[in-house]
Amino acid sequence: MNKLIYYFGNNGSDGNASMNNILGNKGAGLAEMSNLKLPIPNGFTITTELCNYFYKHNNNFPKNFQNELQQAISKLEVTTGKIFGSTTSNPLLLSVRSGSTVSMPGMMDTILNLGMNNEVCNALADACGNKLFALDSYRRFLEMYGSTVLSIPSDLFEQIYENHKIQADIYKDSDITVELLEKIIDDFKRLHIKYDKQLINDPYEQLESAIKAVLYSWKNNRAIIYRKLNNISEDFGTAINIQEMVFGNLGKTSATGVAFTRSPSTGEKKLFGEFLINAQGEDIVSGTRTPMPIIANDSNSMQAMMPEVFKELSQIAKKLEEHYLDMQDIEFTIENNKLYILQTRTAKRTAIAAINIAVQMVKEKLISKEQALMRIDPESLNQLLHTRIDYSKGLTSIAEGLPASPGAATGIVVFSPYDAEKLSHHHKVILVRHDTSPEDINGMHVSSGILTIRGGMTSHAAVVARGMGKPCVCGTNNLSIDEQKQILIAGDIVIKQGDIITIDGGSGKIFLGEMPLIQPTFSEESKLILDWADEISSLKVRANAETVNDALVSIKFGAQGIGLCRSEHMFFDKNKIPLVREMIIAPDIERRQCALQKLLPLQTEDFKSLFRVMKNKPVNIRLLDPPLHEFLPTTEEDKKNLANSLNLPLSMIHQRLHAMHEVNPMLGHRGCRLGICLPEIYQMQIEAIFTAIFELHKKEHIESNLELMIPLISNVAEIKKLKMYIYEVVQELEQRYSYKFSFTLGTMIELPRAALESKKIAKEVDYFSFGTNDLTQTTYGISRDDIASFLPYYLEEKIFESDPFTTLDEEGVGELIEIAIKRGKSSNANLKLGACGEHAGNPTSIAFFHKANLNYVSCSPYRIPIARIAAAQAKIKQGS
């Protein structure tokens, strides 16, 4: 078996920072600090290989491990001049800490002051001349060992401790006496015996039990949950770091604390942190005492109280940051005015701090732009783009669903789009529905947030909300709506229309009442790092947008064009929907043409507004795609209004609606099939688009950059048929206006057959745009609106590694995309390639699109900054 124990300390180290995989983060950091000659407590690291062996061999150690451990302790005794378990001279006490290869703060176990018993406690008191300190250390050991190794509930120790303080009329820990500590220790021992039938006094037995406890903690519930949430492998295992104890609880010249080399909240370049005098590390973490700042303008700071130690800590912090070239999180102890560094690691930080620090370090010439970009978590930019809940206030949610669209919103509950529109004039509203449909668009538009009982991360509500930049929570199966009573039920809680709730689209949590919110910020540093991303990336980022507001937001966030304009979204405007319904219900082509002619000028103005804002940036307009039933009324009141407006009997409306019913409309009469069977619809749209282009050119001297896209192709014959229709209309308009139009023609590749037939299809078009939402649906045979009913189980059982509608399935859907690219390029070398599904805003999927040599991705406006960073990171990682 490989070497299991690596030494570190004042005499150097067996390891270094590059050995993270076997020494863990903490052990590698201690080894590196030893090599930098920094003051650290001497010790050794037991490698992650022991953890893996332990779990593979029925929780047993390798044969020679105990001998190696005793040799390591002997070496530590020589180095420190202290004896482990000594009852006559200065005894060696140990700390035993976990150390995963990936930082998992607070998830695994630690034992301090190990090696204590009655005789060792007396020897320690004699050696330092401080019995109160020795007893305090013994008390701490019994509590930590009892709760960690023996699984005694920690609150039982806390109760004993607090009861003794109350009986002695003592309220501050600093006033505790030797006599009181002796009573507390006696009760702690009795608690050990009650749970374990014995008191473990042998230091080596304590050490072996502590090592096992740390190994067991690798698979405790909180560690398992943390790894799942953060995608950390179970196979890494944990290292164990064993060090001589240094004591921050020796009196007024001793302390413990945590320091950051820069502010983890803002990134400001100054030492930031807290410390406690006469304390050990768990006192800061537990919150039982209020720590003091390291730097402050008053006498309670370390800078004022311990100026020499503060100066040394500042120098070490600077040295560590310059060595690791990143902000550091440093744990330290001060023993009788001597500073010891216990740990350094890359510090966690907010999104704004990450950006500010990255920009600062480039300007300080510590790192390159590429390194700066790799420091940014693309998803963390959601913090900058959306309002979020201030969780520091300690809040309790009433329910939880899927985090479908980030941001937080507070408002009164409404149950219909009509009520949302009516009440939004005077209140912020949260639209609560079983699910949403395109008909709800106006209600969604005026709502501050959207909550649906059904649906997943790519449901209609989720997709539209992300496009609008509105918070949305979907799939809240622990909520129910009683539509007759107009109430929302969460367990025993009944929420009526008009009651206030808060939703968090970033976590999926729902709260009763108004929660404290933090407003978003977008700094100059944020803009600068996004500019660096654009300099580096080869993959362009466009927006999915069809309104002027969408387009303006997209430009603000750096979109290089519109990659998907869903023209049908324009039809849901309240001024247009009656005409659209009239066109659909019309019993003959003459009446349909009449309705289309009324729609024509309205569509023309829509397109003019979009082209005007985009100013010659590419605008990719998809012709009408969804099935027509989505535009039709669902309530009796709306059906009556439609009948009256068309001067038709209500029975005929019902008859037409029944005739248009489809069992599976998403695979039915939609997309290019509509354009072929009802060519007058596409002809109206084409006339509106090209008329808008001509009028902007002639009247406003604005040139447009049109890309025209045909949806849901499965057969090259469909392209040929629609291409003929399109060019007939364009040629007629060119003659009418005496103007030559310039545009490119493309198609969506969103059906497996289209991907397989792409060689033929590519000959007829200028570009492909991969519609990965429908391509995923039709490849898997899974409805994105219904996946929420089984996805959690599939993820838990590892049937799916991730939600295929969030992260692109590279093996199945990805292979179809690669086939389409290869075959398409073989017949059309100049074929341009884009992607416009929800995956186009997902960093992992963007890495795939970069590798596949796409020209652009197109995502919802509020995903654009995330996509820009992810595109640059993909280029940096893949080196091309």
Swiss-Prot record:
Residues 539-880 are annotated as: C-terminal. GO terms for molecular function: ATP binding; kinase activity; metal ion binding; pyruvate, phosphate dikinase activity. Coiled coil: none annotated. Residues 1-348 are annotated as: N-terminal. It comes from the Bacteria. It catalyses: pyruvate + phosphate + ATP = phosphoenolpyruvate + AMP + diphosphate + H(+). Residues 504-538 are annotated as: Linker 2. Activated by light-induced dephosphorylation. Inhibited by dark-induced phosphorylation. Both reactions are catalyzed by PDRP1. The keyword Cell cycle does not apply. Substrate binds at residues 566, 622, 750, 771-774. Residues 349-405 are annotated as: Linker 1. The active site is at residues 460, 836. The keyword Amino-acid biosynthesis does not apply. ATP binds at residue 97. Transmembrane segments: none annotated. Belongs to the PEP-utilizing enzyme family. Homodimer. The N-terminal domain contains the ATP/Pi active site, the central domain the pyrophosphate/phosphate carrier histidine, and the C-terminal domain the pyruvate active site. The reaction takes place in three steps, each mediated by a carrier histidine residue located on the surface of the central domain. The two first partial reactions are catalyzed at an active site located on the N-terminal domain, and the third partial reaction is catalyzed at an active site located on the C-terminal domain. For catalytic turnover, the central domain swivels from the concave surface of the N-terminal domain to that of the C-terminal domain. This is Pyruvate, phosphate dikinase. The gene is ppdK.
